[in-house]
Amino acid sequence: MEYTFRPSLDEQPTTICLAEYNLTVKKGKQETVIPYAVINEVVLNKSNGKQFRAKLLPDGGKPIVITNTYRTTSKDVEDRSRAYATFVRVLHFHLKDKSKAKFSTIVTALKLFRFPKSYLPTEIPLEFLP
Protein backbone atom coordinates (compact mmCIF):
# COMPACT_ATOMS: atom_id res chain seq x y z
CA MET A 1 0.00 0.00 0.00
CA GLU A 2 1.17 3.52 -0.78
CA TYR A 3 0.07 6.86 0.69
CA THR A 4 1.22 10.38 -0.27
CA PHE A 5 0.75 13.56 1.76
CA ARG A 6 2.10 17.10 1.98
CA PRO A 7 1.25 18.99 5.19
CA SER A 8 2.77 22.32 4.06
CA LEU A 9 4.19 24.03 1.01
CA ASP A 10 7.56 24.19 2.77
CA GLU A 11 7.85 20.41 2.56
CA GLN A 12 8.17 18.12 -0.41
CA PRO A 13 5.43 15.55 -0.90
CA THR A 14 6.09 12.41 1.15
CA THR A 15 5.12 8.93 0.03
CA ILE A 16 5.11 5.98 2.40
CA CYS A 17 5.00 2.46 1.00
CA LEU A 18 4.00 -0.41 3.27
CA ALA A 19 5.60 -3.76 2.52
CA GLU A 20 5.50 -7.08 4.38
CA TYR A 21 8.25 -6.35 6.93
CA ASN A 22 9.10 -2.66 6.51
CA LEU A 23 7.93 0.69 5.30
CA THR A 24 9.72 2.98 2.86
CA VAL A 25 9.58 6.76 3.23
CA LYS A 26 10.16 8.63 -0.05
CA LYS A 27 10.74 12.39 0.06
CA GLY A 28 12.16 13.91 -3.10
CA LYS A 29 15.11 11.74 -4.16
CA GLN A 30 15.66 10.41 -0.65
CA GLU A 31 14.37 6.96 0.35
CA THR A 32 14.51 5.51 3.85
CA VAL A 33 13.57 1.92 4.65
CA ILE A 34 12.38 1.32 8.22
CA PRO A 35 11.69 -2.20 9.48
CA TYR A 36 8.44 -2.48 11.45
CA ALA A 37 10.43 -4.14 14.25
CA VAL A 38 12.22 -0.84 15.09
CA ILE A 39 9.07 1.27 15.41
CA ASN A 40 8.72 1.91 19.16
CA GLU A 41 5.59 4.01 19.27
CA VAL A 42 2.59 5.15 17.23
CA VAL A 43 0.69 8.24 18.37
CA LEU A 44 -2.61 9.17 16.71
CA ASN A 45 -3.58 12.82 16.98
CA LYS A 46 -6.70 14.80 16.10
CA SER A 47 -7.05 18.59 16.13
CA ASN A 48 -9.69 21.03 14.92
CA GLY A 49 -11.99 18.11 14.13
CA LYS A 50 -10.59 17.74 10.60
CA GLN A 51 -6.84 17.43 10.99
CA PHE A 52 -5.47 13.98 11.70
CA ARG A 53 -1.88 12.90 12.28
CA ALA A 54 -0.09 9.65 12.93
CA LYS A 55 3.37 9.97 14.44
CA LEU A 56 5.74 7.02 14.16
CA LEU A 57 8.76 6.89 16.46
CA PRO A 58 11.42 4.52 15.12
CA ASP A 59 14.32 3.43 17.32
CA GLY A 60 17.24 5.81 16.75
CA GLY A 61 15.54 7.68 13.91
CA LYS A 62 13.63 10.88 13.33
CA PRO A 63 9.88 10.85 14.01
CA ILE A 64 7.70 10.36 10.94
CA VAL A 65 4.56 12.51 10.96
CA ILE A 66 1.82 11.44 8.54
CA THR A 67 -1.16 13.74 7.88
CA ASN A 68 -4.51 13.47 6.14
CA THR A 69 -3.83 16.52 3.96
CA TYR A 70 -2.01 17.40 0.76
CA ARG A 71 -1.33 21.12 0.36
CA THR A 72 -1.31 22.11 -3.31
CA THR A 73 -1.15 25.92 -2.97
CA SER A 74 -1.18 28.40 -0.11
CA LYS A 75 -4.99 28.35 -0.19
CA ASP A 76 -5.82 24.88 -1.47
CA VAL A 77 -5.63 21.81 0.73
CA GLU A 78 -6.66 18.44 -0.63
CA ASP A 79 -8.41 16.28 1.96
CA ARG A 80 -7.04 12.74 1.81
CA SER A 81 -9.01 11.43 4.76
CA ARG A 82 -10.27 8.24 3.13
CA ALA A 83 -6.83 7.17 1.95
CA TYR A 84 -5.29 8.22 5.30
CA ALA A 85 -7.79 6.12 7.28
CA THR A 86 -7.10 3.07 5.11
CA PHE A 87 -3.35 3.63 5.40
CA VAL A 88 -3.49 3.87 9.21
CA ARG A 89 -5.52 0.65 9.43
CA VAL A 90 -3.12 -1.27 7.16
CA LEU A 91 -0.11 0.12 9.06
CA HIS A 92 -1.59 -1.10 12.36
CA PHE A 93 -2.23 -4.52 10.80
CA HIS A 94 1.48 -4.81 9.92
CA LEU A 95 2.69 -3.49 13.27
CA LYS A 96 0.52 -5.68 15.50
CA ASP A 97 2.65 -8.81 14.97
CA LYS A 98 5.93 -7.37 13.68
CA SER A 99 6.60 -4.65 16.24
CA LYS A 100 6.60 -4.09 19.97
CA ALA A 101 5.33 -0.54 19.49
CA LYS A 102 3.18 1.22 22.05
CA PHE A 103 0.00 2.73 20.63
CA SER A 104 -1.51 5.92 22.05
CA THR A 105 -3.75 8.86 21.21
CA ILE A 106 -3.63 12.56 22.03
CA VAL A 107 -6.31 15.21 21.48
CA THR A 108 -4.72 18.62 21.00
CA ALA A 109 -7.81 20.74 21.52
CA LEU A 110 -6.73 21.39 25.11
CA LYS A 111 -2.97 21.67 25.05
CA LEU A 112 -2.91 21.95 28.82
CA PHE A 113 -4.22 18.43 29.34
CA ARG A 114 -2.54 16.29 26.69
CA PHE A 115 -2.47 12.92 28.37
CA PRO A 116 -1.81 10.02 26.03
CA LYS A 117 -4.30 7.17 26.15
CA SER A 118 -3.17 3.69 25.15
CA TYR A 119 -5.01 1.36 22.78
CA LEU A 120 -4.46 -1.98 21.08
CA PRO A 121 -3.46 -2.03 17.39
CA THR A 122 -6.50 -4.20 16.68
CA GLU A 123 -8.81 -1.62 18.29
CA ILE A 124 -7.99 1.76 16.74
CA PRO A 125 -10.17 4.44 18.37
CA LEU A 126 -12.54 5.54 15.60
CA GLU A 127 -12.53 9.17 16.75
CA PHE A 128 -8.88 9.34 15.65
CA LEU A 129 -9.71 8.33 12.09
CA PRO A 130 -11.43 10.67 9.64
Per-region residue spans from a language model:
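Anionic N-terminal interaction surfaces
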Residues: 1-15
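Short, hydrophobic/aromatic-rich segments at coil-to-beta transitions
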Residues: 1-3, 20-23
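Alpha-helical transmembrane spans
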Residues: 3-4, 107-130
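Terminal export/targeting leaders at protein ends
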Residues: 7, 17, 31-33
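Glycine-centered tight beta-turn/hairpin loop motif at sheet-sheet or coil-to-beta transitions
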Residues: 11, 29, 59-61
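Short, exposed beta-strand/loop patches in secreted or surface proteins that constitute
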Residues: 14-18, 55-57
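Phosphoinositide-dependent membrane-docking surfaces
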Residues: 21-24, 30-48
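Acidic, Ser/Thr- and proline-rich intrinsically disordered linker/docking segments
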Residues: 42-115
